[in-house]
Amino acid sequence: MKKKLSLTVSKLTCKRNSISIFNPLSFKVSEGQMLLIKGKNGRGKTTLIHCLAGLLSYQGLVKWKGVEGKIGYIGHKFGLKEYETVYDFIKFWKAVYGSKVCIYEVVELFSLFNVLFSPIAFLSFGQKKKLTFVRLYFFNNNVWLLDEPFSGMDDNNRELIFNMIESHISNKGMIILSTHEKGRILNIKNTKEL
């Protein structure tokens, strides 16, 4: 029997140079929910995401249940090969994850026709960030950790990301998302704030 997806965090703290980045945190997130980590720059949002991803050491308890495979993560560094074309990037990640999704479908969904054979180095910041969501789309996992996913995105790409988030939540996925944004993101169904 498949375990229900959940994340339980108890008394989580993280220190750098013996200084606490944030006060001890405790919260629970279940499948079909998004935890919205709000706050100004420098308040520990990225540090918290890194702790949950296992990228930083911490004190306290972080307990994942029902996670199938790996956790999808999008942060500030994209991990893109600048010399690679967009097409090569898409083809590579489709193969890595064994995705059955057609390349044409991805190119159309993410509006990549006009840059398909361009080297990634020629793309704007927002276009590069969009490619990280292409990778997440192929990954097809149930937990997403998204650190400031809307920064550098134009209105059309923001809409695309909003739709991906809403779809993921409605399909019983879980999202932990950090942002300093206000507005529509706060209105996504089944959202908890931290």
Q: For the regions a protein language model found, what residue spans apply to each?
A:
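Conserved ABC ATPase "signature" region
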Residues: 101-116
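Conserved structural motif at the start of ABC-family nucleotide-binding domains
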Residues: 7-9, 21-24, 153
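ABC-family nucleotide-binding domains
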Residues: 41, 147, 153-154
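Q-loop/switch helix immediately C-terminal to the Walker
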Residues: 77, 82-100
